[in-house]
């Protein structure tokens, strides 16, 4: 995590995340993204991408809070609202720990890749992927959808991530 970077979280309409990112990324000094995750699609039997946190856009910038607020207020699409989440009036909704977890689990393209593991004593043991060494955080696993539920406190959201068991 770069100390001169500031992280912001925007709430918007589900399915409009990419539209918001596109507008924000046209501004100098702003990097906006909507994290994606790989998951196993049962019907197509392929790994596909979907939004990790529907309705959320993350913004990383070296600009000051005042400059970023000005860009947020100029958002041109009236049919799409954006609202910056803050703990208090001037404190971003992301803690340093949340930023660390997010950057640790995602790759450079802001995608949480599929993890792979084995079942040992009725517990998932991840052998490769971003969840490596995080077995204790897995509290539930759905074999049919190949999704693990993580016990991570992050914007009051439940993390459901892709984990495929290998023989």
Identify what each model region corresponds to:
Residues 127-129, 153:
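A structural micro-motif recognizing beta-strand termini
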Residues 122-124:
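Generic structural signal for buried aliphatic residues
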Residues 129-131, 141-146:
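Short, conserved beta-turn/loop elements at beta-strand boundaries and strand-helix junctions
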Residues 134:
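Structured alpha-helical
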């Amino acid at each position: 995590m770069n100390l001169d970077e500031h992280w912001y979280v925007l709430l918007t309409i589900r399915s409009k995340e990419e539209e918001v990112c596109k507008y924000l990324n046209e501004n100098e000094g702003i990097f906006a993204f909507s994290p994606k995750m790989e998951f196993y699609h049962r019907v197509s039997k392929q790994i596909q991408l979907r939004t990790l946190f529907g309705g959320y856009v993350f913004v990383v910038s070296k600009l000051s809070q005042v400059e970023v607020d000005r860009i947020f207020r100029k958002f041109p699409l009236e049919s799409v609202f954006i609202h910056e989440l803050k703990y208090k009036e001037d404190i971003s909704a992301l803690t340093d720990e949340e930023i660390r977890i997010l950057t640790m689990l995602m790759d450079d393209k802001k995608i949480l890749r599929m993890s792979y593991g084995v079942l040992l004593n009725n517990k998932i043991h991840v052998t490769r992927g971003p969840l490596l060494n995080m077995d204790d955080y897995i509290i539930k696993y759905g074999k049919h959808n190949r999704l693990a539920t993580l016990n991570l406190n992050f914007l009051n959201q439940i993390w459901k991530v892709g984990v495929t068991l290998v023989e």
